[in-house]
Amino acid sequence: MIGWLHGTIGDRWQEGNRCWLLLICGPVGYELQVSESLWRGTALESPTTVHTHLQQREDGQQLYGFETKADRNLFRLLISVNGVGPQVALGLISGLGAVSLLQAMAAEDVKVLCQAPGVGKRTAERLSLEWRSRLQERWQQQGGSTPLRLVEPVAESRELRATLEALGYGPEEVSAAVAQAGSQGLDPEQPMEEWLRHCLAWLSRQAG
């Protein structure tokens, strides 16, 4: 399994709404389909680190690339949902962004989810159900008993921790991210979305 790659951009192009990079790593060039946010932030011959997912297909293999570990793990969660393929998953991440997408799934905001190309009402409902189930499992593992309230202030950090751990981050990484956000003066009464945004940004910088 190829978890991440670091190299130089040898080529970059678009085919319709699909974004592609050719990443030169030593004597090997890897062709990746990438999220739009990653593609727009690259330039030819620039050094780039890409978090990757290798997909097995009937006609071969396909590498998908992402700017952050969180985006990559979110992509894996999305494609595990019935009816959501790689293109729909990329469209959700590129169109909404990780934080807004997580917020929409947690809040069961079907209208927002349906803004992404290829996502209808039934798919949006399945996405919300799958994410809530995954998040509830993490929440219960941490001793939570009350319903999750992702749109509420972060007076209790267990909900935030459950969200970050569901994206694949370990307990120590999560603790460091939450502590860092607090040390930067983020108000405990700020909505969950703001804390999540700060934590994901910090975790992304550490991975880079």
From Swiss-Prot:
InterPro entries: DNA_helicase_Holl-junc_RuvA_I, NA-bd_OB-fold, RuvA, RuvA_2-like, RuvA_C, RuvA_C_sf. It is found in: Cytoplasm. One of its GO terms (cellular component) is Holliday junction helicase complex. Residues 68-146 are annotated as: Domain II. GO terms for molecular function: ATP binding; four-way junction DNA binding; four-way junction helicase activity. Keywords: Cytoplasm, DNA damage, DNA recombination, DNA repair, DNA-binding. GO terms for biological process: DNA recombination; DNA repair. Residues 1-67 are annotated as: Domain I. Gene3D superfamilies: 5' to 3' exonuclease, C-terminal subdomain (1.10.150.20), Nucleic acid-binding proteins (2.40.50.140). Residues 157-208 are annotated as: Domain III. Has three domains with a flexible linker between the domains II and III and assumes an 'L' shape. Domain III is highly mobile and contacts RuvB. Homotetramer. Forms an RuvA(8)-RuvB(12)-Holliday junction (HJ) complex. HJ DNA is sandwiched between 2 RuvA tetramers; dsDNA enters through RuvA and exits via RuvB. An RuvB hexamer assembles on each DNA strand where it exits the tetramer. Each RuvB hexamer is contacted by two RuvA subunits (via domain III) on 2 adjacent RuvB subunits; this complex drives branch migration. In the full resolvosome a probable DNA-RuvA(4)-RuvB(12)-RuvC(2) complex forms which resolves the HJ. Belongs to the RuvA family. This is Holliday junction branch migration complex subunit RuvA. The lineage of its organism: Bacteria, Bacillati, Cyanobacteriota, Cyanophyceae, Synechococcales.
